[in-house]
Amino acid sequence: MKVLGFRAFLAGLCLAAVSATAQAQSNPLYVPLGPAKAVLYKPDSGPAPHIGIVVMHRVANYLSHIACTEFSKRGFVVLCMNSRFDNNEVRVVWEQIALDVKAGVEYLKRQPGITKIVLFGHSGGAPTMSFYQAVAENGVAFCQDPKRLTTCDNNLAGLPKADGIVFADAHPGFPMTILRGFNPSILDENDPGKVDASLDPFDPKNGYNPKGASNYSPEFQKRYFEAQSARMNRIIDRALALREKMKRGEHYYKDNDIVIISRGGNPVGGPGGVASLHVLQPSLESIMSTARPQKLIKNDGSIVTEVISSVAVPDPGTRETNMSFDVGTKVYSVVSFLSNNAVRSTNSLDGIDHCTSNNSTVCAVQSITVPELYLAMGAANFIRDTEMTFDLAKSSDKDFAVIEGALHPFTPCRPCEKTPGQYSNTVKNLFDYATNWINARF
């Protein structure tokens, strides 16, 4: 009875959230999967599906993610999951999340008629799914590389492989996004009020514009990116030293301890609180534009090939949130920081040693062979990162396109529009393209 009650609650939640598409998923089923949670979405009509799609993030609630309804109404069985660490960044042990993906893959494989499994990695779901598949294809040697800041256990041996992956506005790795959001002007981790004014991104002398797009000089950008890496490396060194003290029994706590990063960005990983230059200056081509002509899916569904720049608007208001506790301060444990949020680098732009972290889409895709689709959102911040990840991917069957005018959650960027409705079809275009790509292969 409790399961039925929760099913009814979820059905109501999904109907309210996505009423325009609810006819295709009128009876989602809650599925407990050990420490993970899941909701199964099936088409109400049409041919019996043979493709199952797994949707999950490392900590976000994806039980009613837009992909659940959009894919199921297009004829797929979709399992939308929450990991064992849902809504709890402090508790994350990154490598364990692959066990939750495994449970989802195995569950879908047991469903009648399902012969193919596709992983859907949106945002932080991208490193989640790519890590899983890299270990599934290569074994635990991939995640036990001594280069990693943390390694996996042998319980990840024998993960069942998926047949393909769709990456949608993928994080290149969560540690990389954390790194680029750091405010590197902090001089003392115990006193965030002490700053190096020459590195302050919110100082007009350095190019900050409180009323619109900022304009940082190439010289400032270079120093800033290097200083972001220097700060990350210092915090890593502190955490590693503390981990060793705990191992030796020389610390009060023998298992774990707190890591607080002031002016480091939103503690729940969402928008706000960051000191990312590309958020303040969206015209930053090194991050916000493709390096060469790529496919752009226009609002009318047509496709053109051109150099693509994000149409994102600046967010100068991050000055206030970056200085706050609730939105601008990261709160981790030593374990969650090192496994889920840390990466070595010499500069945050192009000097990142991606494979020092197991939480890295960029690292994982270099060891994955199944077909991969990369879709970047044209009004978000991951256009160049997605292109770079696509270029490095080992798969011989891969595709890359940008959805014009789409925000990170796939919805239209209304403030970016020059005319009302200019980007009205972002959701349809994304899921139509992904559906055609999946059906053509599986």
Report each predicted region and the residues it spans.
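Short beta-strand element of the alpha/beta-hydrolase
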Residues: 48-58
